[in-house]
A protein has these predicted regions:
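Intrinsically disordered, low-complexity regulatory regions of eukaryotic regulatory proteins
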Residues: 3, 42-43, 537
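Short, Lys/Arg-rich, polar N-terminal cytosolic tail immediately upstream
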Residues: 1-13
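Short, low-complexity, Pro/Ser/Thr/Gly-rich segments in the mature regions of secreted, periplasmic
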Residues: 529-545
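Membrane-proximal helix-loop-helix interfaces that form the catalytic/acceptor-binding platform
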Residues: 13-527, 544
Length: 546
């Protein structure tokens, strides 16, 4: 029979893996259970959907490599998920699952570097980071990069410690996955190869006698890792022209207060500079403490955090698309190790009796702003768009058309992709599920997209998001449309005068114009007025049939 003392001994002996397991399960629940199915699509998710929804994996790989020059691993994973279920969950599930994998693997990585207690702290930091929470909810390759960074770093450390050749193959695979997940994985892998060379040099500083197997394993791992780096560097090289690499200013200005403010806000989860500064101080102190007690961990954290920043400060690019909260997410292993070093040092200095409580309290205080940010993000969603999509899907006929979606959404959310969301949310039995949404196309492409059914046009459907939907809905009803509101989203439908494409275009133009007259501040809807007027004109001229 398990007694209280026995249970206490078990908890004291096994608390690190239990904490890591709790962190992993908590991350899984909050990411998958809160809003994964409801949020509008981000700009980049449209690219992911366009590539990953190709007919076959070979076609996905071809488009990813030859046309997008993007991360093939991410597109292939999303393709497999969409083959399982073609909906919003299928689109975003790989990112969520790989975020869960990242948290789980982070414990093993941390245990290898800073012990069982440190591994638990690494898992908690990874699971509760606002960066990890945010990136796990959207269909991009960042969580794949984080998970692969943890896995490859863990295998690299095991390889150096054991010197066994059996770890070379698994390491090479994870290194390839790291650079296949995202272009910025190149910086993570380069740091990893530098660390491998440093750790191997330390092990071999007294000569090769008795360590030839270690030397051979390290050389093989370095060669294979280097080949993965060069291979994906070649794949991503066309992106240099897109982002103006080699011209413009530094990607990162280390002396820029704006960069550190934005990076600190993302890491801490708060716009108050003091919280970001506190995390930075704890990180530096953690590395300093590790330099005294665990030099291997100190070297890892220092190189992993500093080397990529130095490289990116030297690299120049004219593009303004760099976002530290996403592109530098691969720094998470170094940051988590430094935080673990800080907590372990506090525990050691506070003594055996209260050290654990002091360390836990300090970590909780440092991570609290991030937890608040996590709560705010996870609670900031509603089912309005999904309800609107299901309402339309239930009534969408086989000859109906969905016009370009428009309106005002949150930052980085694309109103043109509301149509893509509606198609993904529609049950397979609804004709809406097979509709190819208009997206951002215009002119003759828009004409062909509206006429894709090649049949007499039935009802024209519009979905728009406006700040004040009541007057817009009333005006649309007065104009003869059927309107249903879902929060700020309006679903409007009307039958064109004639069952032709040009009549459908003119009907959509009229409804958009009516909405703008009711709410002149709906600037994106105003764009649709011009877009559909032009499409109707080019269709009437016969230009699109040539």
């Amino acid at each position: 029979m398990l007694t209280r003392d026995g249970a206490g001994r078990i908890l004291r002996a096994r608390w690190p893996p239990l904490v890591a397991l709790t962190a992993t399960l908590a991350y899984a629940v909050v990411v998958i259970g809160f809003g994964l199915d409801f949020r509008p699509l981000h700009n980049d998710e449209g690219v992911t959907l366009g590539v990953a929804s190709r007919a076959s994996a070979i076609d996905v790989l071809r488009v990813a490599v030859e046309h997008r020059h993007g991360p093939p691993l991410h597109y292939l994973l999303v393709h497999a998920s969409l083959a399982w279920r073609y909906d919003i969950l299928g689109l975003r599930l790989p990112s969520a699952v790989l975020g869960i994998v990242a948290v789980a693997v982070s414990y093993g990585f941390g245990r290898e570097l800073v012990g069982r207690g440190g591994g638990a702290i690494v898992a908690v930091v990874t699971a509760s980071s606002p960066i990890t929470i945010h990136l796990g909810q959207f269909a991009r390759g960042y969580t794949a990069m984080i998970a692969a960074a943890y896995a490859s770093a863990w295998l690299m450390l095991v390889l150096i410690r054991t010197g066994k050749a059996r770890w070379v193959g698994p390491y090479a695979v994870t290194a390839l996955l790291l650079v296949s997940a995202h272009p910025f994985g190149l910086f993570a892998l380069f740091s990893e190869l530098v660390l491998m060379a440093i750790f191997a040099a330390v092990r071999l500083r007294h000569g090769l006698r008795g360590q030839r197997r270690l030397a051979a394993a390290v050389v093989a791992a370095l060669v294979l890792g280097g080949l993965a780096l060069l291979l994906l560097r070649h794949l991503y090289s066309p992106l240099q022209g897109k982002y103006g690499v080699g011209s413009g200013t530094s990607v990162i200005k280390l002396g820029s207060a704006r960069f550190w403010e934005r990076f600190g806000d993302a890491a801490s989860g708060s716009t108050h500079a003091g919280f970001g500064v506190a995390l930075a101080v704890a990180t530096v102190l953690g590395v300093a403490a590790l330099a005294v007690r665990n030099r291997r961990a100190a070297i890892f954290a220092a190189v992993w955090l500093v080397l990529p920043l130095v490289l990116l400060s030297v690299l120049t690019a004219s593009s303004r698309d760099f976002a530290p909260e996403r592109h530098l997410s691969f720094l998470l292993p170094g940051y988590a190790v430094a935080m673990a070093g800080f907590a372990l040092e506090l525990r050691a200095r506070a003594g055996a009796r209260f050290g654990g409580l002091v360390a836990a309290a300090a970590v909780a205080v440092l991570l609290a702003p991030g937890w608040v940010a996590d709560h705010n993000e996870l609670s900031d969603f509603n089912a309005d768009l999904r309800d609107a999509s299901l309402y339309m899907a239930d009534r969408f006929g086989p000859d109906d058309v969905l016009a370009t979606t428009s309106g005002t959404l949150s930052q980085a959310e694309d109103p043109r992709l509301v149509g893509a969301y509606a198609v993904l949310a529609a049950p397979s039995s609804s004709p809406l599920a097979s509709w190819q949404h208009a997206g951002p196309v215009r002119g003759c492409k828009l004409v062909r997209r509206i006429g894709q059914r090649r049949a007499p046009v039935g009802t024209v459907w519009l979905v728009m998001s406006v700040p004040d939907p009541r007057p817009v809905a009333q005006s649309l009803r007065t104009a003869g449309a059927d309107v249903r509101g879902f929060g700020t989203f309006l679903v409007a439908s009307a039958i064109p005068r004639q069952p032709t494409v040009i009549s459908a275009l003119l009907t959509a133009h009229y409804l958009f114009h009516t909405a703008v007259e009711a709410d002149p501040s709906a600037y994106d809807v105003r764009r649709m007025v011009r877009l559909y007027r032009h499409a109707a004109a080019v269709d009437a001229s016969g230009e699109c049939s040539r």
